[in-house]
């Protein structure tokens, strides 16, 4: 191979490595803070404090359940935290929450449910699995198994807490 060709290939290789490095660093930086709306972020703090639930946990659930999209729907569950009006009709009435597509109402209903689960079960991974409708939640907990769902949320919660200086 000619010397000029080797130099060109070396430069091209270094450019690719540099580009990939910047892309990876940029991707990591992008995941450091939450991408939920400013209003949802504020509601997580307001409602989290009201229910004594870590606001970062609420943010992590929102990211996992809906990627921060208040109009998300899946199998009868709607909104940021994927709440089912069918299962939480009484809770919604009690809380005065009328629209699960409304960020505040959705977070309020979900936080109320999570608070109930935390009072009953205490263990975050178990609470998250039950919240997610995992029929094996109790068995997983008793066997010391943390689901990917719960693990992802707990990891993201810890990351957000670090970013927020906790």
Model-based region annotation:
Residues 62-77:
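Conserved alpha-helical segments that form or flank metal/cofactor-binding pockets of metalloenzymes
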Residues 41-42, 55-59:
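Short amphipathic alpha-helical segments
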Residues 77-80, 147-149:
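Glycine-rich, phosphate-binding/catalytic loops in enzymes
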Residues 60, 80-82, 127-130:
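Structural recognition of the beta-strand scaffold that forms the well-ordered cores
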Residues 2-43, 47-51, 69, 86-166:
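Non-catalytic cell-wall polysaccharide-engagement segments
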Residues 74-76, 84-87:
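Solvent-exposed, flexible loop/coil residues
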Residues 53-56, 75-78, 122:
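Extracytoplasmic
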């Amino acid at each position: 191979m000619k010397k000029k060709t080797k130099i060109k290939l070396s430069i091209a290789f270094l450019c690719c490595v540099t580009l990939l490095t910047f892309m990876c660093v940029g991707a990591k930086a992008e995941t450091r803070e939450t991408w939920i709306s400013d209003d949802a972020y504020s509601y997580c703090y307001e409602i989290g404090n009201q229910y004594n639930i870590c606001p970062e946990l609420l943010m992590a659930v929102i990211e996992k359940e809906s990627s921060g999209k208040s109009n998300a729907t899946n199998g009868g569950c709607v909104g940021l935290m994927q709440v089912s009006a069918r299962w939480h009709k009484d809770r919604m009435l009690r809380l005065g929450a009328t629209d699960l597509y409304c960020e505040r109402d959705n977070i309020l209903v979900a936080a109320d449910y999570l608070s109930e689960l935390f009072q009953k079960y205490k263990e975050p991974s178990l609470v998250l699995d039950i919240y997610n409708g995992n029929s094996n939640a109790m068995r997983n907990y008793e066997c010391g198994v943390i689901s990917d769902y719960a693990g992802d949320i707990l990891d993201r919660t810890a990351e957000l807490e670090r970013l927020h200086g906790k």
